[in-house]
């Protein structure tokens, strides 16, 4: 019985570690370089992580699921653009997030924009592909919409 409990704890610990392997960049410059290198679009997640109920719900129901994490690994570079009320944030990140919020005309949370970075004459542009937000129905329903947005870029 002890061996079974220990084995279950090890399996649960491994599953938790695997779920935490998803990397969300907070610096858009770093994410853009990575996206250009990997030839993948950016997924820009505009969120209020410590106050926005719909943002927290989207994370729980979609963004922190194994289905989403597997899809994201193959399809996008993840960027979290947070607008917290209680959590301190570096001034550079606050400024970057505010500029991107204005650039993408984000008016509510959560908002997710898909953008394709392109580089021309040493300058990087973010071409908007489409946006999403909270979609009821779990990861399958949300990913269906995301795949439609990404299919339109081709």
Residue ranges and their predicted role:
Residues 49-52, 83-88, 107, 119-121:
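Solvent-exposed loop/turn segments at secondary-structure junctions
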Residues 24-42, 72:
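A short beta-strand-turn-helix
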């Amino acid at each position: 019985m002890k061996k079974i409990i220990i084995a279950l704890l090890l399996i649960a610990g491994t599953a938790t570690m695997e779920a935490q392997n998803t990397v969300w960049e907070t610096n858009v410059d770093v994410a853009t370089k990575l996206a250009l290198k990997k030839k993948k679009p950016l997924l820009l997640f505009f969120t209020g992580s410590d106050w926005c109920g719909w943002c927290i719900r989207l994370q729980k129901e979609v963004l922190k699921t194994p289905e989403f994490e597997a899809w994201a690994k193959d399809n996008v570079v993840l960027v979290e653009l947070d607008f917290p009320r209680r959590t301190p944030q570096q001034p550079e990140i606050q400024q970057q997030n505010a500029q991107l919020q204005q650039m993408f005309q984000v008016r509510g949370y959560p908002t997710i924009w898909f953008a394709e970075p392109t580089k021309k004459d040493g300058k990087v542009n973010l071409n908007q592909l489409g946006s999403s937000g909270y979609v009821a129905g779990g990861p399958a329903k949300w990913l269906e919409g995301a795949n439609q947005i990404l299919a339109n870029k081709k």
